[in-house]
Amino acid sequence: MELMLLFAKLPEAYSIFDPLVDVLPVIPVLFLALAFVWQASVGFR
C-alpha cells in the first residue's frame, strides 16, 4: 500500500522536469539540421 502511495507522489516530484520533457523531442531535429549544416560547410562531398 505504501508503494502505491509513493508512485502516486512521483509525478509531482518530477513536475520540475516538465519543460525539459517538452524540449526533448526537438533534439533529433537539431541533429538533422546540424548534419545538413556540416555537409553544406564541406561542400556535400
From Swiss-Prot:
One of its GO terms (cellular component) is photosystem II reaction center. It is a single-pass membrane protein. It is found in: Cellular thylakoid membrane. The chain crosses the membrane at residues 24-44. GO terms for biological process: photosynthesis. Keywords: Membrane, Photosynthesis, Photosystem II, Reaction center, Thylakoid, Transmembrane, Transmembrane helix. It holds the Pfam family PsbK. Residues 1-8 form a propeptide. HAMAP family: PSII_PsbK. One of the components of the core complex of photosystem II (PSII). PSII is a light-driven water:plastoquinone oxidoreductase that uses light energy to abstract electrons from H(2)O, generating O(2) and a proton gradient subsequently used for ATP formation. It consists of a core antenna complex that captures photons, and an electron transfer chain that converts photonic excitation into a charge separation. Belongs to the PsbK family. PSII is composed of 1 copy each of membrane proteins PsbA, PsbB, PsbC, PsbD, PsbE, PsbF, PsbH, PsbI, PsbJ, PsbK, PsbL, PsbM, PsbT, PsbX, PsbY, PsbZ, Psb30/Ycf12, peripheral proteins PsbO, CyanoQ (PsbQ), PsbU, PsbV and a large number of cofactors. It forms dimeric complexes. NCBIfam families: PRK02553.1 (NF002715). This is Photosystem II reaction center protein K. The gene is psbK.
